[in-house]
Amino acid sequence: MVQKILAVLMFAVMLTACGTENAEDNSISVSESAETTEDAVLTYEQISAEDAKKLMDTASDYIIVDARTTEEFAEGHIPNAILIPEYEIADRAPDELTDKDRLILVYCRSGRRSKIASQALVELGYTNVKEFGGIIDWPYDVVTD
């Protein structure tokens, strides 16, 4: 009987030792994961259509990027917007958006592509990117070509 109790105690000690080793390994992983997350913090700011309109009315130096397709842009876009489709941002932004600190307001149809385009701009080094969703939620004037 004493041997069985001793065997159970030894087994418990071994399990505890194994559990402690794994906990230490996990803490290292969590720490490394936190550092990775801190590096990925760079992002754009999401604002409402109303806030974007206020910036357009008050800011002196900004650019509006429409991240939709050429066809969608022709159907109607925000006045003074330039068309750079989301899938062309990486190729065209360096040539068309030369000041990386300039205020850039980005929109698309519903907000999905403008989020992708905005994050791509940030990853390219642009520092003042604001995404304001889609033109379907834009209650102000639009123009057509």
Where are these regions (language model features)?
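Rhodanese-like catalytic fold shared by cysteine-dependent sulfurtransferases
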Residues: 2-6, 18-50, 55, 74-102, ...
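Short acidic/histidine-rich motifs immediately flanking catalytic phosphotransfer sites
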Residues: 60, 103
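Structural scaffold elements adjacent to functional motifs in cytosolic proteins
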Residues: 63-66
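Residue-level signal for mature regions of secreted extracellular proteins and peptides
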Residues: 11-12
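Solvent-exposed coil/turn segments that connect beta secondary-structure elements
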Residues: 68-70
